[in-house]
């Protein structure tokens, strides 16, 4: 097996890693290190921090965020399908209908379980 043909790929990967790592290391080594309490405090538009930055959030915010990402990805999968609708034919149309049916059933399940209720 001739591995010489992979040398440009290896070189490309090494140069890419070096371009990312070398500035980080140089900044860490050569940069000034003068810690100060004001630098370590959170910044809130020029005001003193009102509350602890590590306050707890209700888990429903995370659930809504996950559901948003899920249905946002659904739209991202639908755009290429819509562009190539004429080329994929009936088989592609049926596949997308199955995909949408699964997502609608999942959404209905989340709604029925009360995941979207804020009371």
UniProtKB/Swiss-Prot annotation:
Its main location: membrane. It holds the Pfam family Oxidored_q4. It is found in: Cell inner membrane. InterPro entries: NAD(P)H_OxRDtase_bac/plastid (IPR023043), NADH_UbQ/plastoQ_OxRdtase_su3 (IPR000440), NDAH_ubi_oxred_su3_sf (IPR038430). Keywords: Cell inner membrane, Cell membrane, Membrane, NAD, Quinone, Translocase, Transmembrane, Transmembrane helix, Transport, Ubiquinone. Coiled coil: none annotated. It comes from the Bacteria. It catalyses: a quinone + NADH + 5 H(+)(in) = a quinol + NAD(+) + 4 H(+)(out). Its EC number is 7.1.1.-. It is a multi-pass membrane protein. GO terms for molecular function: NADH dehydrogenase (ubiquinone) activity; NADH:ubiquinone reductase (non-electrogenic) activity; quinone binding. The chain crosses the membrane at residues 9-29, 63-83, 88-108. One of its GO terms (cellular component) is plasma membrane. NDH-1 is composed of 14 different subunits. Subunits NuoA, H, J, K, L, M, N constitute the membrane sector of the complex. Belongs to the complex I subunit 3 family. NDH-1 shuttles electrons from NADH, via FMN and iron-sulfur (Fe-S) centers, to quinones in the respiratory chain. The immediate electron acceptor for the enzyme in this species is believed to be ubiquinone. Couples the redox reaction to proton translocation (for every two electrons transferred, four hydrogen ions are translocated across the cytoplasmic membrane), and thus conserves the redox energy in a proton gradient. This is NADH-quinone oxidoreductase subunit A. It comes from Verminephrobacter eiseniae (strain EF01-2).
């Amino acid at each position: 097996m001739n591995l010489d043909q992979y040398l440009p790929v290896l070189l490309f990967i090494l140069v890419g890693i070096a371009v990312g790592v070398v500035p980080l290391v140089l900044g860490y080594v050569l940069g000034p290190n003068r810690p100060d309490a004001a630098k370590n405090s959170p910044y809130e538009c020029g005001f003193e921090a009102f509350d602890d930055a590590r306050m707890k959030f209700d888990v429903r915010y995370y659930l809504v965020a996950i559901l948003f990402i899920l249905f946002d990805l659904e739209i991202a999968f639908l755009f290429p399908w819509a562009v190539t609708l004429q080329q994929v034919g009936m088989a592609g149309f049926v596949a997308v209908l199955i995909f949408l049916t699964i997502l609608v059933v999942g959404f209905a399940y989340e709604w029925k379980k009360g995941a979207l209720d804020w009371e």
